[in-house]
Swiss-Prot record:
Gene for this chain: dphB
The UniProt record lists the keyword Methyltransferase: yes
Name of protein: Diphthine synthase
Function: S-adenosyl-L-methionine-dependent methyltransferase that catalyzes the trimethylation of the amino group of the modified target histidine residue in translation elongation factor 2 (EF-2), to form an intermediate called diphthine. The three successive methylation reactions represent the second step of diphthamide biosynthesis.
Pathway assigned in UniProt: Protein modification; peptidyl-diphthamide biosynthesis
Taxonomic placement: Archaea, Methanobacteriati, Methanobacteriota, Thermococci, Thermococcales
Organism annotation: Pyrococcus horikoshii (strain ATCC 700860 / DSM 12428 / JCM 9974 / NBRC 100139 / OT-3)
UniProt-listed Enzyme Commission number(s): 2.1.1.98
Annotated keywords: Methyltransferase, S-adenosyl-L-methionine, Transferase
Length: 265
């Protein structure tokens, strides 16, 4: 039989595509995970009501360590849907799951949905000018990750924008805000002193992408770090060299200071 990786989109249950909904309704079993992203505009109950089926929510451990024992045996005999926030294979974990399904002899298909990679277009930044992405992770104990700082540096040297995903600890209901991410980046700057991320760095904040009322703000770190961007999820973007249209958009739509029209272009 078949395993379907079905994207749920970005914000609420209405973001799933018609194709995804039709296939999910026909499946014998429906699983989902919500630890890779937050769909702030919906609930499990609303998704179940839309699909008309009970959904078993899998934990990170279920997905990463027990997928072969929980999902794949059922997919060998039945049609199974695995629902994921955003677009299914944007999360590298899900790509690995499809490899496992292939090796287990389970046929699989991917049903796409809105993704943060397309939604960032609402910031006015040109998609083709984004470089490598990175995740700003919460420090834990003696572990203080800094690789995202290096990604910003590498992209900036090429004039490219950096999309920063912000850490999620779904089991603890912890969703990093853009403010927390900026604070962490300033700490890393103090450690590395590379001039990559300072109070005068231009940043763009996008909150609740996919909703009807997203927050889109652009400005210098010193001006935005204390601003309230509303409920998560948030992402943080560090722009590279701006095209004049990008700069004008950030000024007119995202509230960036007009001086970026001559400084950053």
């Amino acid at each position: 039989m078949v395993l379907y990786f079905i994207g749920l989109g970005l914000y609420d249950e209405r973001d799933i595509t018609v194709k995804g909904l039709e296939i999910a309704k026909k499946c014998d079993y429906v699983f989902a995970e919500f630890y890779t992203s937050l769909m702030a505009g919906t609930t499990l109950g609303r998704i179940q009501k839309l699909i008309g089926k009970e959904i078993r929510v899998l934990s990170r451990e279920d997905v990463e360590l027990n997928f072969e024992n929980i999902v794949l045996p059922l997919a060998k005999e039945n049609d199974v849907a695995f629902l994921t926030p955003g677009d299914p294979l944007v999360a590298t974990t899900h790509a690995e799951l499809r490899i496992r399904a292939k090796r287990a002899g389970v046929e699989s298909y991917v049903i796409h949905a809105p993704s943060i990679y397309s939604a960032v277009g609402i910031t006015g930044l040109h998609i083709y000018k984004f470089g490598k992405s990175a995740t700003v992770a919460y420090p834990e104990g003696n572990w203080f990750p800094t690789s995202y700082y290096d990604v910003i540096k590498e992209n900036a040297e090429r004039g490219l924008h950096t999309l920063l995903f912000l850490d999620i600890k779904a089991e603890k209901r912890m969703y990093m805000t853009a403010n927390e991410a900026m604070e962490l980046l300033l700490k890393v700057e103090d450690m590395k002193k590379g001039g990559v991320f300072t109070d005068d760095t231009l940043v763009v904040v996008l909150a609740r992408a996919g909703s009807l009322n997203p927050t889109i703000r652009a400005g210098y770190v010193k001006d935005l770090i204390r601003e309230d961007f509303g409920d998560p999820p948030h992402i943080l973007i560090v722009p590279g060299k701006l095209h004049i249209v990008e700069a004008e958009y950030l000024v007119e739509i995202a509230g960036a200071p007009r001086e970026i029209l001559r400084v950053n272009v």
